[in-house]
């Protein structure tokens, strides 16, 4: 075929998608329609395919969280959480190993690395769903937890009655009725013996056993009885207080127990008995006894170092402990009073590390001054079956106990077992009015609700669990949370219900109680397991603008007074995400951006917070990511780039596509910056999808700075000519048809970082797979990649003038294509409008391409766009040059009518 008389109109600039203006008006070098392609310098190609990295997870769950965690030994471990609530880790390359099961199912997650641990927040996209957790490569523990639900049973001077006392050869042997805990280096006070010659203060000569000791005294041989023996001590006379603190294996000191007091006689030691047990708390490695000086109200403890008294108990089985201290030694110890202000961190949506602190947001609101609602504060009473801080009912507590199955959400949980005979089981209460300090729990005219996690144990078929408010004097017995066996299973389920009338009670009786019990004669040998009770004002279920901040270098301690920040409170928005940029901490709300920084003096509650933007925000925890000293924010109006100044929109060219995002599910979108390949990936739910079913990809490969990304859009405007034009160095957008619930840059054993994607639901179901984007994979796990690129409509007005062709019908006679790949290159032409495609002959691809591909087409049209692509498993293309040969229609350049 001859192409004599035709004009070549080469296209070697392949820009990104632009659909915010009519396709017929686009300048040369951009695309009105493309998908599943990636951009190279001077070329466009099929995007990387999906390579399944691991054996699919059983049950085909979706994978809702991915993150690389660097362990203390510097080994990189990919962490993954699936929709079944299982945490996985890649401990050996290519193999996932289960770390923990039983996390909240169907939850997403975010995390941050700090202090060689990974801190994880599980959420529903809006607020927290599960307790905050930390993973150190060995243990998956809760972040912060309550302290003991009650203090020790008693504290008293160490003094024992003497059962027998005798003197032989100037050595006195003493038998006591109870242990005194004395050491061979101690002195003992003997008083009240019938034979007064024995009385006095003497150095111990030897300890025979816990009930027998000797001391030297020159006198005649004799024996006697009565009296007391007390080791000489240093405790000052007067009223002292004692509280108990749990110490975890992560080094966290909990909030102290409610304190108890005793009056010391002076000059003796003290025996602390009934110390809260930690048998149900696997992460507690020690207990600390904190004391006040005589008549004081500030608590201190000492650690036994440098000759100081020992107040740490490392034997977790011990229920009693003898202490000896002077007020001088005590007050020179470690101050513990501030620990009473600690609050247990609630379920949060996100977490970030900054200035050696952790910051958490999206917390579910709860009251923090009830006793042992999570049952992590220990058990006591008969058989250690009563949760500390609760009062067992004298008649109906039978059947209540700690759960011995080890199935707690975390730490301990409360079990109510039936016997098939007695109707009411496991009844226990605590006051609903105020805590031991007098701080209010419930207020009049305020409605309250409760969250409770429940599961069954055994073959439970009858009975009803109740968590409600009760008063005998006023006849109050609210419905509260009620759970029947048909509502639960062997997995934890959370129930939320009001426990008071909507407007609360007009007056609060003195006997107002929170009650937990089961009635309806629960099945013998089966019952209810109860955990994580949370009480909150019904109208304030979430802390929308509050950010919890830990102490510096103390990531589990959250002060209820100074350890939080209020970010533009009461503005109708919620803190959704956070990021770091140039030593500053930014908080992103739904439609605003705020910044703070460590002032080096105060706790976070006193830091200054400034608003950066009152328009740019994100609906998603994962809606922000950081690139090379800049951040990107995905919001309802578009994608914005922020480099410390004013956020600049960088997605205007695809606004119609952005508008297809289902913002009712906007909390599920995610953003990830691939700094190696210079791409920004944004997974979004479009149409009616409720999770990300499309990835919007911005290629900035040819751009070297944030300023260029902001300013060099797909189409530029010439102030000289007043016309639009495209350039090679520009933003290039393209949608990728990939369904993925999560994305991360995974650190690999070869030293590279690769984009990993957690599968999302396709057809309503997941497949249990984690994918890697791979340039050597030419299918999506065996499925064809339908990749194509559509050119602009040839010719632009400028080129018509340049080639002197005029703006009438043209004959497109021939195509020359420089492309390589595999499979067949599919070609279509759109004459005058995208709505009217014409299929062209396919062309075989090879790599490398030995020559240009040529095709006669003889196509008429005022303007024509061409689409090239592949759509078979293993097929791919790379297009570097596209040349149509054309001339004015030699027969009828105009129709002469319509």
Where are these regions (language model features)?
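Disordered, low-complexity "stalk" and linker segments at domain junctions of extracellular
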Residues: 2-7, 14, 57-60, 89, ...
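Extra-cytoplasmic beta-strand recognition segments
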Residues: 375, 379, 425-464, 495-503, ...
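Extracellular glycan-recognition surfaces and repeat-rich motifs
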Residues: 381-417
């Amino acid at each position: 075929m001859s192409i004599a008389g035709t004009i070549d109109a080469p296209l070697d600039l392949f820009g990104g998608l632009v659909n915010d203006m009519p396709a017929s008006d686009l300048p040369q070098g951009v695309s009105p329609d493309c998908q599943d392609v990636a951009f190279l310098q001077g070329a466009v190609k099929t995007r990387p395919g999906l390579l399944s990295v691991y054996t699919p997870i059983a049950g085909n769950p979706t994978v809702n969280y991915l993150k690389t965690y660097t362990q203390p030994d510097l080994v990189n471990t990919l962490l993954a959480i699936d929709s079944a609530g299982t945490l996985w880790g890649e401990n050996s390359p290519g193999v996932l190993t289960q770390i923990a099961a039983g996390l909240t199912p169907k939850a997403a997650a975010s995390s941050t690395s700090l202090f060689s641990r990974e801190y994880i927040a599980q959420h529903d996209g809006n607020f927290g769903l599960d307790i905050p957790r930390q993973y150190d490569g060995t243990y998956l523990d809760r972040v912060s937890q309550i302290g003991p639900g009650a203090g020790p049973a008693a504290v008293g001077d160490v003094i024992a009655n003497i059962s027998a006392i005798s003197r032989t050869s100037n050595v006195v042997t003493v038998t006591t009725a109870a242990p005194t805990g004395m050491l061979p280096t101690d002195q003992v006070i003997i008083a009240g013996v019938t034979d007064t010659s024995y009385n006095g203060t003497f150095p111990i000569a030897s300890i025979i056993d816990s009930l027998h000791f000797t001391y030297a005294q020159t006198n005649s041989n004799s024996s006697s009885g009565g009296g007391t023996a007390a080791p000489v001590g240093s405790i000052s006379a007067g009223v002292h207080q004692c509280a108990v603190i749990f110490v975890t294996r992560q080094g966290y000191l909990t909030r102290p127990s409610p304190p108890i007091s005793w009056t010391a006689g002076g000059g003796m030691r003290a025996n602390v008995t009934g110390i809260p047990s930690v048998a149900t708390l696997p992460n507690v490695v020690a207990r600390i006894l904190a004391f006040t000086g005589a008549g004081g109200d500030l608590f201190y403890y000492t650690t036994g170092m440098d000759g100081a008294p020992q107040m740490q108990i490392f034997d977790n089985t011990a229920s009693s402990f003898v202490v000896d201290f002077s007020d001088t030694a005590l007050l020179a110890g470690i101050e513990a009073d501030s620990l009473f202000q600690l609050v247990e961190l609630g379920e949060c949506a996100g977490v970030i590390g900054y200035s050696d602190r952790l910051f958490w947001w999206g917390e579910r609101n709860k009251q923090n001054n009830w006793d042992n609602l999570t049952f992590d504060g220990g058990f006591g009473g008969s058989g250690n079956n009563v949760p500390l801080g609760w009062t067992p009912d004298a008649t109906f507590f039978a059947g209540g106990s700690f759960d011995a199955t080890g199935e707690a959400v975390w730490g301990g949980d409360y079990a109510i077992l039936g016997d098939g005979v007695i109707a009411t089981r496991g009844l226990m209460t605590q006051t609903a009015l105020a805590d031991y300090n007098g701080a209010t729990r419930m207020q009049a005219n305020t409605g309250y609700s409760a969250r409770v996690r429940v599961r069954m144990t055994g073959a439970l078929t009858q009975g009803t669990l109740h968590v409600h408010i009760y008063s005998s004097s006023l006849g109050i017995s609210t419905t509260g949370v009620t759970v029947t066996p048909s509502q639960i299973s062997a997995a934890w389920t959370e129930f939320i219900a009001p426990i008071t009338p909507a407007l609360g009670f007009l007056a609060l009786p003195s006997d107002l109680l929170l009650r937990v019990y089961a009635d309806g004669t629960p099945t013998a040998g089966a019952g209810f397991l109860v955990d994580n009770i949370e009480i909150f004002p019904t109208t304030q279920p979430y802390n929308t603008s509050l950010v919890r901040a830990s102490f510096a270098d103390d990531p589990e301690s959250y002060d209820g007074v100074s350890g939080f920040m209020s970010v533009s409170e009461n503005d109708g928005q919620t803190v959704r995400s956070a990021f770091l940029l140039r030593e500053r901490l930014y908080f992103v709300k739904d439609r605003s951006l705020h910044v703070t920084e460590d002032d080096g003096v105060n706790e976070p509650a006193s830091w200054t917070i400034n608003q950066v933007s009152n328009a740019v925000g994100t609906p998603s925890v994962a809606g922000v990511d950081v690139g090379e000293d800049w951040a990107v924010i995905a919001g309802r109006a578009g994608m914005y780039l922020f480099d410390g100044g004013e956020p600049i929109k960088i997605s205007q060219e695809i606004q119609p596509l952005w508008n297809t995002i289902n913002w009712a599910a906007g909390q599920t979108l995610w953003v990830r910056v691939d700094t190696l390949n210079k791409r920004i990936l944004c997974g979004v739910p479009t149409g009616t999808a409720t999770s990300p079913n499309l990835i919007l990809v911005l290629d900035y490969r040819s751009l070297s700075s944030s300023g260029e990304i902001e300013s060099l859009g797909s189409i530029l405007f010439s102030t000289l000519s007043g016309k639009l034009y495209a350039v090679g160095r520009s933003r290039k957008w393209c949608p990728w048809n990939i369904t993925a619930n999560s994305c991360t840059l995974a650190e690999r054993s070869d030293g590279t970082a690769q984009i990993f994607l957690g599968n999302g639901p396709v057809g309503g179901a997941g497949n249990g797979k984690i994918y890697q984007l791979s340039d050597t994979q030419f299918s999506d796990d065996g499925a064809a990649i339908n990749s194509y690129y559509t050119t602009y409509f040839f010719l632009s007005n400028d080129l018509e003038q340049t080639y002197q062709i005029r703006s009438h019908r043209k004959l497109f006679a021939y195509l020359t294509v420089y492309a390589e790949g595999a499979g067949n290159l599919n070609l279509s032409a759109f004459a005058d409008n995208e709505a009217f495609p014409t299929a062209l002959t396919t062309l075989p691809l090879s790599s490398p391409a030995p020559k240009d591909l040529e095709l006669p087409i003889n196509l008429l049209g005022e303007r024509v766009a061409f689409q090239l692509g592949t759509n078979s498993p293993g097929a791919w293309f790379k297009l570097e040059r596209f040349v149509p040969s054309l001339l004015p229609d030699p027969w009828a350049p105009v129709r002469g009518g319509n």
